[in-house]
Amino acid sequence: MGLELYLDLLSQPSRAVYIFAKKNGIPFQLRTVDLLKGQHLSEQFSQVNCLKKVPVLKDGSFVLTESTAILIYLSSKYQVADHWYPADLQARAQVHEYLGWHADNIRGTFGVLLWTKVLGPLIGVQVPEEKVERNRNSMVLALQRLEDKFLRDRAFIAGQQVTLADLMSLEELIQPVALGCNLFEGRPQLTAWRERVEAFLGAELCQEAHNPIMSVLGQAAKKTLPVPPPEAHASMMLRIARIP
């Protein structure tokens, strides 16, 4: 069997992997794992990834379970354009510099609104307002550092061309936008960067990948989202409790 990607497009890293594969014409079999329905907790999926998370890449018997590793693997195996993951040592190091910072400062911060506005209420949990406010402040600080440290006078995060760093960052920053927090407002530098990245990726592909998250708030308001099964509640409550 060929390349399989286990994804849920509500997940930021899943979207990054999906967009990358589509943009670069990489053939793959999409295996949708519906997180809201708890499909990641199934015995069948745990045989693919015992960590019970997406995205997952399965290439024959070879399995990868971290989005950055997946993107690097796809870049190398399919010999995509060099700008994505540059061969030049210093340019590549700059991509890794951002990805390291991203994991600590962006990844766990910009997804919190999905939990406070959608996932928590789905299981009857209200996140304290002081946590919501702290998260809002953390996002503002992270955005400022993203601009000051990485974008500066550059067109893209790691230089003058799109890299994996831009794709990973964009997908995280889209998450709060979809949930009613326009964090690009009043930030012309960040807005221009977003427009450049989306123009490169293509409007049609971005719309396709972003549609599930862009519609989730409306679905929640209409109560048309699936309610997570009881076996998912414990892990969801633990994740909510870990919101700083």
Curated annotation (Swiss-Prot):
Cell compartment(s), UniProt: Cytoplasm, Cytosol; Nucleus
PROSITE patterns for this protein: GST_CTER, GST_NTER
Catalytic activity of the protein: RX + glutathione = an S-substituted glutathione + a halide anion + H(+)
Binding site for glutathione: 40-41, 53-54, 66-67, 104-107
Domain of life of the organism encoding this protein: Eukaryota
Gene Ontology biological process terms in this record: glutathione metabolic process; response to salicylic acid
Keywords: Cytoplasm, Nucleus, Transferase
Protein EC: 2.5.1.18
GO MF entry, a single one: glutathione transferase activity
Enzyme class: transferase
Residues annotated as domain GST C-terminal: 88-230
Tissue: Highest values found in liver followed by testis, adrenal gland, kidney, lung, brain and skeletal muscle. In liver, highest expression found in central vein limiting plate hepatocytes. In lung, expressed mainly in club cells of the bronchiolar epithelium and, at low levels, in type II alveolar cells.
CC terms in the record's Gene Ontology section: cytoplasm; cytosol; nucleus
The protein's assembly and partners: Homodimer.
Job description of the protein: Catalyzes the inactivation of reactive sulfate esters in carcinogenic arylmethanols. Highest activity towards ethacrynic acid and cumene hydroperoxide.
Family from the record: Belongs to the GST superfamily. Theta family.
Protein's name according to its UniProt entry: Glutathione S-transferase theta-2
Source organism per UniProt: Rattus norvegicus (Rat)
